[in-house]
């Protein structure tokens, strides 16, 4: 058995895939999850479950003792919420606690899960973005949290002299996805006949590939590098057409300008506040994605 690796956010979609890849490589895994977390993605896996809160420094420090590497997945994955702080705080405090724990435990590297949200998109449909690009927009709290927490993580890496590798997955789809997230909700809304697409292009990655690449980064990742984990870039319209082809359900497309899309999104947000249900499109999503191209 190889060394122990601590995986935060272990019960999530990406965590379940990462852990399987680590186990295949012979690593011992500590799965850091919140109390009462949904553990369906970890059923029957030979892992040590550690309960705690990423915002609680003491529990993260205890979990990291004896580990060689930390893979930090834990984050609040929501594109719409009552407050920005509910999404920002766990991201920022989580980064602080992970690096403090790594320093205390003498851990040599942290594999830090960021997101292509931290790179963003461009109005130029021909431009290819790279790992040198940063997204400083505040349109979507989750995206802004990813940018700021990753930037903080690089600072903490220097402060604590702990090596860091940042992995930036695109939209993740695939196996061991048991909960409703912004990624799969978009598809579910389409299947239910209430989803709609806007003019843009985004990049995707299979969950198995994303997990395998996190496991590979433990051994092969170069300290100090950002790696984009994204495959084919696809227009939302093409995605909707694919869903329609597979499900037989018509998916609406909004070939409107940004200003009209924003107006539609405002209406949906107003309805959402009354129904207490997350809207399929928000003003932030439109500003971030409408007529924007995320190609890497």
Show where each model-derived region lies.
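NAD(P)H-binding glycine-rich loop region in Rossmannoid oxidoreductase-like domains
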Residues: 36-93, 101
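A conserved pocket-lining segment of Rossmann-fold NAD(P)-dependent short-chain dehydrogenase/reductase
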Residues: 136-138, 185-209, 213
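N-terminal Rossmann NAD(P)H-binding glycine-rich loop of SDR-like oxidoreductase domains
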Residues: 3-27
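Conserved beta-loop-beta element that borders a ligand/cofactor-binding pocket
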Residues: 114, 149-175
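Mid/C-terminal beta-alpha module of Rossmann-like enzyme folds, strongest
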Residues: 213-280
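Conserved Rossmann-fold NAD(P)-dependent oxidoreductase catalytic core, especially the SDR/UDP-sugar
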Residues: 72, 76, 82-141
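Glycine/proline-rich active-site loop of Rossmann-fold NAD(P)-dependent oxidoreductases
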Residues: 159-162, 174-185, 217-227, 249-251
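Active-site YXXXK catalytic motif of short-chain dehydrogenase/reductase
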Residues: 142-147
